[in-house]
Amino acid sequence: MRTYETVTILKPQLSDNEVAEFLNSAKEFITKAGGEIVSEEKLGRRRFTHEIDHVRDGFYVYLKFRALPAFVKSWDEMAKLNEQILRSIVMLSIEIKAKAQTVK
């Protein structure tokens, strides 16, 4: 399994309860596919620099999870069909290890 990060932008008219419901259903979607949640964060409502589907702001949700590579396609299909989602992107999470420096 690989580690992925996703940022999903939800429609601004959703209530806090609806955002929480989406987050729970997204976590359930990941775990039912055999994945595991590493971390989650509600980033809140933010204004866009340009309109997306005639909307000026949205509610950002961040999830970090471990899943099989084939799961990403399932996530993308779900995001396209879910009317609460304006945009969603999944990225492969790469851990960068600091290199030790020697002092002369």
Curated annotation (Swiss-Prot):
InterPro entries: Ribosomal_bS6, Ribosomal_bS6_sf, Ribosomal_S6_plastid/chlpt, Transl_elong_EF1B/ribsomal_bS6. One of its GO terms (molecular function) is structural constituent of ribosome. One of its GO terms (cellular component) is ribonucleoprotein complex. GO terms for biological process: translation. CDD domains: bS6 (cd00473). Keywords: Ribonucleoprotein, Ribosomal protein, RNA-binding, rRNA-binding. Pfam families: Ribosomal_S6 (PF01250). Belongs to the bacterial ribosomal protein bS6 family. Binds together with bS18 to 16S ribosomal RNA. This is Small ribosomal subunit protein bS6.
